Amino acid sequence: MSRVPLPDSFLRLPITHRALHDRAAGRIENSPAAIKAAVAAGYGIEVDLQLSKDGVPMVFHDEELDRLTDQTGAVNARAAAELGRIALKGSTDTVPTLAEVLTLIGGKVPLLIEIKDQSLVMGPTDGRLEAATAEVLKGYRGDVALMS
């Protein structure tokens, strides 16, 4: 694996954890509204990824939908299109894909992506989320870093 130096933008700007969320304002963590607010404020953004049933990186922190939506069950048990129709509690936003978030950010601020543990036991990974994330990031021109 090759490593490159962290871009300076990650050290100059505050990084918002799960974007600039504020439940009272209807900006739920990792939501499009929270992403837009962070970009408008000029802050970097950290988001979390889970893999959908059909292999699409989804911007969502938890393994289960229960805490942030009115649905139950695992994120990885549903297809991306279905997840994209599920509203986040207290918001009209739905669960976004990584590709949608990249479009919202458009390279304006740095993006720190956390690859969430897919084994749920902090064990070995099958590499599917990592590979799908790398594929979506191809051609993205903004500053981005990944962590797990």
Region roles according to the model:
Residues M1-S148:
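Phosphate-group recognition and catalysis centered on beta-loop-alpha active-site segments
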